[in-house]
């Protein structure tokens, strides 16, 4: 048996739902999708859900993951085995842990490939900080998986599809976190997962002010701007949402232009699926050149203006 009888899907991030739904179609015969509102339910049906389960009644001061109890009860009531697919977001991983505990089944995070062999899920994901790929065969009847971005292609909506809609009512857990305040933060409005062309900067760009050169290059070629983890986490030059690497974005663009990035493995696992990698680095021995299809050895601050000028001609 190379598919499960059913799969359960939930995404706290709407943009990740089409990808998870496509994976669900490949892995199971029946797709159940938990949603938070009617609009998401309609989208889920168009993406292939046979049954939509609307989570309803959560107080505003409670967290989404507090639905774990009623979600686990619903899953348990409708089948003895199957898959649960969640995005590998922070909330997705927290919910996965809660579901795994309540269902008493195995949880595997950051899956990069998923298959079914003899009725059991087989999962591959990065281990040892991206230095190797580990394979796990899940022995429990259910497997709760968080899926890395880009593992599956996005499902295409079909307005002619139909499905059944159900309601799952809120039940307060015995122990829970209560939200006392919410503070908005500036977040990345660009969906880098879908970008065809990406210019990514590392600390080799020299300063936050020099990132303007990379932005000009992006404008010249129609690319989106990304960065390495040190640029976002250590230097605070760019938003967290834009850094590429094993613990964040895993990209597959047509072109990945790395500017001042050394090319450590933890970064490259997020970029080495790119069709073409172009590197600019002043260190001729930088690891990035082992991955690059094309490279320029030199100071990015001098090379970028020349490159932008050449593109303008």
Swiss-Prot record:
Subunit composition and interactions: Heterodimer of FixA and FixB.
The gene coding this protein: fixB
Function as written in the Swiss-Prot or TrEMBL entry: Required for anaerobic carnitine reduction. May bring reductant to CaiA.
Organism: Escherichia coli O139:H28 (strain E24377A / ETEC)
InterPro entries the UniProt entry points to: DHS-like_NAD/FAD-binding_dom (IPR029035), ETF_a/b_N (IPR014730), ETF_a/FixB (IPR001308), ETF_asu_C (IPR014731), ETF_asu_C_CS (IPR018206), FixB (IPR023461), Rossmann-like_a/b/a_fold (IPR014729)
A Pfam family annotated for this UniProt entry: ETF
Pathway: Amine and polyamine metabolism; carnitine metabolism
Gene3D superfamilies assigned to the protein according to its UniProt record, in alphabetical order: HUPs, TPP-binding domain
Protein known as: Protein FixB
TM regions (residue ranges): none
Record: residues binding FAD: 255-283
Family classification: Belongs to the ETF alpha-subunit/FixB family.
């Amino acid at each position: 048996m190379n598919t499960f009888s059913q799969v359960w899907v939930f995404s706290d991030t709407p943009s990740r739902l089409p990808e998870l739904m496509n994976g669900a179609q490949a892995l199971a015969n029946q797709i159940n999708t938990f949603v938070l509102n009617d609009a998401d339910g309609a989208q889920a049906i168009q993406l292939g859900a046979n049954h939509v389960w609307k989570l309803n009644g959560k107080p505003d001061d409670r967290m989404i993951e507090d639905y774990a109890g009623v979600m686990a009860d619903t899953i348990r009531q409708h089948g003895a085995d199957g898959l649960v697919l969640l995005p590998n977001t922070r909330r997705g991983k927290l919910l996965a842990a809660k579901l795994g505990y309540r269902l008493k089944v195995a949880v595997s995070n950051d899956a990069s490939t998923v298959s079914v062999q003899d009725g059991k899920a087989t999962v591959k994901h990065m281990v040892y900080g991206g230095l190797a790929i580990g394979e796990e065969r899940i022995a429990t009847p259910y497997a709760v998986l968080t899926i890395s971005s880009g593992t599956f292609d996005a499902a295409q909506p079909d307005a002619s599809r139909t499905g059944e809609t159900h309601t799952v009512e809120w039940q307060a857990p015995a122990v829970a976190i209560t939200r006392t305040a919410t503070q908005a933060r500036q977040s990345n409005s660009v969906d880098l997962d879908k970008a065809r062309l990406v210019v990514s900067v590392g600390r080799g760009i020299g300063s936050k002010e020099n990132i303007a050169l990379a932005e000009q290059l992006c404008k010249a070629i129609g690319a989106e701007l990304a960065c390495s983890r040190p640029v976002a986490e250590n230097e605070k030059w760019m938003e967290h949402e834009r850094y590429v690497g094993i613990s964040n974005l895993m990209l597959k663009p047509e072109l990945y232009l790395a500017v001042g990035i050394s090319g450590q493995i933890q970064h490259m696992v997020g970029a080495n699926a790119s069709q073409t990698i172009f590197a600019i680095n002043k260190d001729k021995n930088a690891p990035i050149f082992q991955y690059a299809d094309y490279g320029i050895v030199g100071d990015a601050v001098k090379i970028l203006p020349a490159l932008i000028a050449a593109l303008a001609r």
